[in-house]
Amino acid sequence: MYLQGFGNYHHSEAVKGALPPNQNSPQHCSLGLYAEQLSGTSFTRPRHNNLRSWLYRILPTVTQGTYYPYEFNIMQPLVDELSPNAMRWSPLYNSSQIKCDFVEGLFHIAGSPLVNAYTYYCNHSMSDKYFANNDGELLFVPYTGEIHLHTEFGKLMLSSGSIAVIPRGVKFKVEVISKEAKGYLCENSGNPLTLPQLGPIGANGLANPRHFQYPVAAFENSVGEHTIICKNQKKLWFTVCNHSPLNVVAWHGNYAPYCYDLSLFNTINTVSFDHPDPSIFTVLTSESEIPGVSNLDFVIFPPRWMVAEHTFRPPYFHRNYMNELMGLVYGEYDAKKEGFIPGGISIHNCMTPHGPDYESYEIAASQDLKPNYINSLAFMFETKDYWQVTEQAYRHPSRQIDYLNCWQGFKIEFSQ
């Protein structure tokens, strides 16, 4: 069961009477609870941008204890001098016999001033271990397996073909439902993700607000040792407290985790000719101070009909002002016949040329242009700043050092 509607002002209580009926912070909360506000923006942001929630919890967060440096860090050094070459990786993870939870299985791929990209692998649930990111919100894009995200606000269920966003500062733990789970993760330290403007598309289309789902209140009333790991100022810290931090019995507000089924995306595409720009596939965006230039765009290339006439239908050859990190959830990407499979990654930074490989080009340039259904799901994390690759990703054996060879079959066919 979920609450529906992107950015709505929701309210939920796991125990009847836990929510104050007429105010935020009564002198004495019912059921012996404590009132606590969680702010996602400054107090004086305009009303339509203002994010906050009131939580009614068994113990306030100030009782969590002292944080100390954690034994390892997920943030990794970035390559100092990065070439303008296109880069691609095969999937980083194989199945592991070693127990690995979500935090232990994070792999830092690349970063920019406001955004970081990771992959995750986990085959072991976080039972009495919790995570919070004070540096930004987290966007989950799974490509195999099923996980449940137990948060301060309630539970989200997540599997391939869906996404979830955990806001900055919200504590959660990952329960692995399948044998193992793998996915992509994007950390956004800019403005919170929101729905893109639709412009001439009109009032409807792309990701519809009604399809975003928020959790109903659920809580853990457990005592004993509970470890909280917190990412703060690019470092990991930990504390051990004597109770679960997921002790919120009721909440109301518009700052909360949410999930979304990507199959509900209302795809807009051409019904005449030419390949539209990929911005029409934007699901969520983090706006910058420059209109139309985003800190982060989350873009998908979902299952869709291709019907353009007298047109080269795959994505065109391109040199972009923006910086692209792509992944594949399932299927075969229509611009890459080989080498780009689910779990793979490609990075094409500003002005780095990219486009269909030779084999894909040859097929698309000569095929009979009947209506064709593409049954795949690729995505892109697009940023205004360069993706700086981490040293560990650059040296990883899954990096395809021969990636550029996929374009070497093209020949000069010009004739006068």
UniProtKB/Swiss-Prot annotation:
Coiled coil: none annotated. The keyword Iron applies. GO terms for biological process: L-phenylalanine catabolic process; tyrosine catabolic process. Fe cation binds at residues 318, 324, 354. CDD domains: cupin_HGO_N. Its EC number is 1.13.11.5. This is Homogentisate 1,2-dioxygenase. It comes from Legionella pneumophila (strain Lens). The gene is hmgA.
